[in-house]
A protein has these predicted regions:
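Membrane-interfacial helix termini and adjacent extracytoplasmic/periplasmic loops
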Residues: 2-21, 78-109, 179-190
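C-terminal transmembrane helix and the adjacent membrane-cytosol boundary/short C-terminal tail
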Residues: 121-129, 136, 147-148, 209-245
Length: 245
């Protein structure tokens, strides 16, 4: 059994090094879907988080609690609910997003958006109160003050976006339900919906361990890159704070 495992890893590395077409297709589609969903989520989430932070309104605490609860939204549940909406009988059936990369992007956005909103609120709340008062006392409008605070908290907000990307790329439940794990046609990456996580699940169940291991190693590599990026951002933030002090 040990020799079979070793042989599986050897074959997996060969698949990666030789740029196996299926491995490349699955990896590229995964990155496209996850980057797109994270980018779109960030465009929505950062302004939304800043708005919630800067305004006092009835039920604000409840809204924040709901957002934080959605951090742990089960991916299978998110996929099921979105499936009902995107099915032909559902209210969003006219979009024809079911079993498409667009549908997977939408599913990942549902999972990532609350995370980035909540962490944006937390990042802005961590700014020194004296700085907030100083910005307002200098005559800045509320919009200008919010923009300045976002710039001040940019390291923490960027870290939130990277964490969102990590959640998106490691998601499997919603991707399986909404995407259907469809293999792409040769030469047309966007014709399929098979991403790293769903492909690993499929290949493992079919006994193709070398391919599953190869995809798993790539997913692990992405996780390492995300972690290194977070550490670099945190180091930059600490250096900035120590320099200012």
């Amino acid at each position: 059994m040990v020799y079979e495992i070793i042989d599986g890893f050897v074959q997996a590395i060969q698949l990666i090094v030789s740029l196996n077409p299926e491995v490349v297709t699955i990896t590229v589609l995964t990155i496209i879907v996850s980057l797109t969903s994270t980018f779109l989520s960030a465009i929505i989430s950062v302004p939304a988080g800043a708005y919630i932070y800067a305004h006092d309104f009835f039920g604000k605490r409840l809204v924040i609690n709901i957002i934080q609860t959605l951090y742990a939204l089960p991916t299978v549940l998110a996929g099921l609910l979105l499936f009902l909406f995107l099915s032909h009988q559902g209210p969003l059936g006219f979009l024809d997003f079911l079993f498409t990369p667009q549908g997977m992007i939408l599913a990942q956005m549902i999972l990532v958006t609350p995370l980035i909103i909540g962490l944006t609120i937390t990042a802005l709340s961590g700014i020194d109160k004296d700085m907030r008062h100083s910005i307002i006392s200098l005559g800045a409008t509320k919009f200008q003050a919010i923009v300045t605070l976002i710039q001040e908290a940019r390291f923490a907000i960027l870290a939130a976006v990277i964490l969102g990307f990590g959640r998106a790329i490691s998601e499997v439940g919603a991707a399986m339900i909404i995407g259907g794990n469809i293999r792409a046609f040769p030469g047309d990456i966007l014709s399929g919906t098979r991403v790293l996580t769903t492909a690993i699940s499929l290949e493992t169940s079919q006994g193709d361990f070398p391919l599953a291991i190869a995809l798993g190693l790539i997913l692990l590599g992405v996780a390492i890159v995300v972690n290194v990026g977070l550490n670099m951002i945190q180091s930059g933030s600490l250096w900035k704070n120590s320099w200012n002090s």
